[in-house]
Curated annotation (Swiss-Prot):
Protein name: Sarcolipin
UniProt signal peptide: none
Cellular component terms (Gene Ontology): endoplasmic reticulum membrane; sarcoplasmic reticulum; sarcoplasmic reticulum membrane
InterPro entries xref list: Sarcolipin
Organism: Mus musculus (Mouse)
Gene: Sln
Example of a GO biological process term: regulation of ATPase-coupled calcium transmembrane transporter activity
Pfam families linked to this entry: Sarcolipin (PF05366)
Keyword entries, A-Z: Endoplasmic reticulum, Membrane, Sarcoplasmic reticulum, Transmembrane, Transmembrane helix
Amino acid sequence: MERSTQELFINFTVVLITVLLMWLLVRSYQY
């Protein structure tokens, strides 16, 4: 259970960082 939760948390963090980076790139590109 803990491993599952940890994996899910890591995946969520990676996705969040990726989305944030893409958003910053798009924003700086448009700006």
